[in-house]
Amino acid sequence: MASRHRRGAFPAGAKAAPEAEAAKESVAVAVRFRPLSPREVRRGEKIAWYADGETVARSEQSNLAYAYDRVFGPTTTTRHIYDAVAQYVVNGAMKGINGTIFAYGVTSSGKTHTMHGDQISPGVIPLAVKDIFNIIQETPNREFLLRVSYLEIYNEVVNDLLNPAGQNLRIREDLQGTIVEGIKEEAVLSPVHALSLIAAGEELRHVGSTNFNLLSSRSHTIFTLTIESSPRGQSNEAEAVTLSQLNLIDLAGSESSRVETAGVHQKEGSYINKSLLTLGKVISKLTDEKATHIPFRDSKLTRLLKSSLSGQGRVSLICTVTPASSNSEETHNTLKFAHRAKHIEIQATQNKIMDARSLIKKYQNEIRQLKEELEQLRRSIRTGTPIEDTMQKKHHLLETKEDCNVKLQSRLEQGEEAKAALLERIEHLTELILVSAKASRTTKSSHCPRRRHSFGEEELAYLPYERQDIILDNESNMLFVPIEGFGEKFKSSPKEETENQKGHLNWLNLRKCDSGSTNLTSSDGENPSSTKSLPALSTPLGIGFFNVTSEQRMSDYMLAENVPANLLCVGHREFPSDSLPVQETPLVSRKTSDHVDILREQFNILSGEVALHQSVLKRLSEEAGKNAMNEQIEMEMKVVNDEVKLNKQKIASLERRISNSMSNSRGMHDNLELSLPYIEIPEQLNEKAFQLEASECQEFLLSERTTFQHNTGIVQETGSQAHKGKPLPSDVSDEFLKKASQAEIDELKQRVSELTEAKSQLDSCNHKLLEESTYAKGLASVTSVELKALSVKVTKLMKQNERLSSELASGRNQRRGSHGPRGARRESHTKRYEPARRGDMNALEAMLKEKDQRQAELHTKIEESKQKEAFLEKELANMWTVLANLKKTRGIDQEDFDSKYNGSWA
């Protein structure tokens, strides 16, 4: 639906929440460093700027440093950046607080990768869309309406990316904010629907190739989500509706003079630099307390960002920079821009409007009151009052009665029309309202932390493939390693590393079903001790592999929760627009299909768990056969056996429930047969994953076995003596303790040797540094001596120059004295007549110039006369032709005409 879209503004009746004045905040600023590209590495580029900790960006070449809210290195993933600086803006938007997230930086610094991402590493926009629908699912006591719009600013022209016909849209302002007239707003029903609209808009966006990037954005884009939320049910009719906007902005990169462009690209670059320069001026004025005028209207971008930059909502700025030394100046300018933006103060408040259904109640009450007033008036007129009326008073009462009747009737008609229109709008919007598919929970459960949901295959289909021209070659990326960020190897945070070291079974922590279905818990949740002895993955490869496996296995299950209640059984990707009616399926079939899908996903997850437990059990049994006295391994085997039995029972119950559900629904049989091949594919992938995990476990256990080889003989001897019934001698236990203490002493000695080696290395480094410092001091002393010698030479040369100049002056004076009075007479003669000669020369030159000017004027006059002569000849020829035509038409003889003509002249 095309409408006049307000940015940072709301319909009439909108007002801030009646709460205490919100505390002042500042713009959240984050800086993201991308790694060096292969081309920069081949050129031998050096690191000019780097991330010093989590909050400081420091220069390698000087002592400059800037502090921000967060600073991310090249190995940081986009999901981590979203959790740190963008998620709180999205949460505020879901509560009615406006939010803006935008990326700023030079060309090829990674802005589009940060905002949009790819299938391996989704960007901020897909993560925000996914998070919004997750919040909707976890808020069963409210209902939501989501509308999206997508526009671009190309060469200072606003274009609609969701409507190809919407070009050169007009921007105007009124008391309620900035309005983009004619932009299309689309109501979205699921993450797949929103991502498909983004992908369609990206097809219309202007891109081009530059010296730094094969596909460079040539326009600014603004993706806006308008979020309406109201209480669910009839219990809270008086509560207002919250309305907010979330702007996700991908700015085009500023270009330096080193970018060789021409023609259209040069024009695009000039417009991009102009808008970004205006943005920098606006931010500088906003941070200047003495500024009286802020130039918001100097560019389309700043006009649209006026409400966000003026402090009417939360703002998060992500500045992407490159650490290469060739772009050191551009990186410094970006960091200065981010430092200025950090000082902008904002005061975010919640926006509330009156609910449409509350307006209906208001109109109904008003109509009822008007009808009561009208009935009372009619009743009073019928019964009458004992008044000594005159005719004039009766006439006046009749007139007032008629006026009141007309007014009341018109108000009744207006109220009925407004009521009908609002009822029609509510009926239309109810089809687009998103509600949670879960049952209402208590307040305590609603405040539980939200679990991270992964992207499904349908959602990933609308994200671009991994960009090959940004940072790394594809040869360095493994096929099954989910490398986020800019293609660097995945590096977990210290907290994540400690969590990964708890064991392989940690990734089996599954989401508990909120309904009455079977609850799924991980093994470490039931028996915390069962995971302590399991080996942790020692390489990033294993970590990345299991992250991919768990996300792929959970994706389809989580996707079913993010689809609205009226679209749970839709199997295709086409979504109804505002103008098309939505086909409603019966409630029973929708619940049955939803239930069967969830049971099927639980079946797949449990089968994967059983396969993993069996592989771990097999490995533990082999280890137990080799180490007969290891009680810890036996306990783990017992725990895993219990887990396998419990999961098999759950699988059997799920199979029974699936068969019962399938028997109750006829139409679901074909869908189940179609989905069986898709069930086999995750099982095959899980088997491959389990094989890889088994090999990792084997390597770990082999390393553990080698560490305990020196105790194997003693354990076997004590075991044989225990079987024979002999008492254990005390010297054996003492020997065992001695060997254990000896092993600890050896380990400590090894550590001491390592520390001594490190100390020796540090001493050698210090020695080298001392040598270099002494060498530098020697050079400084030598240079000082040379400078002194040079200064002495310079003074000598200056004195010699003065002596030579004095000799030259004396020689000239002697020569003048030798010429005598004759030479002086000649010089006086030349000086006397030289001004006269110069005056004559100047007069001659002036006369020559005047002559040339006159000749040029004469030439121009001659040319003009020739042109006039030619023009007159043409006119004369035309006159003769006209006369000939006249003679022919009138039939006059030529001789008579000549005689008359000559006679008249005679």
From Swiss-Prot:
This is Kinesin-like protein KIN-7G. The lineage of its organism: Eukaryota, Viridiplantae, Streptophyta, Embryophyta, Tracheophyta. Residues 813-823 have a biased composition (Basic residues). GO terms for biological process: microtubule-based movement. It comes from the Eukaryota. InterPro entries: Kinesin-like_fam, Kinesin_motor_CS, Kinesin_motor_dom, Kinesin_motor_dom_sf, P-loop_NTPase. Residues 803-840 are annotated as: Disordered. CDD domains: KISc_CENP_E (cd01374). It holds the Pfam family Kinesin. Residues 346-385, 733-814, 839-875 form a coiled coil. The keyword Magnesium does not apply. Keywords: ATP-binding, Coiled coil, Microtubule, Motor protein, Nucleotide-binding. GO terms for cellular component: cytoplasm; kinesin complex; microtubule. Belongs to the TRAFAC class myosin-kinesin ATPase superfamily. Kinesin family. KIN-7 subfamily. Residues 26-344 form the Kinesin motor domain. One of its GO terms (molecular function) is microtubule motor activity. ATP binds at residues 105-112. Residues 824-840 have a biased composition (Basic and acidic residues). SMART domains: KISc (SM00129).
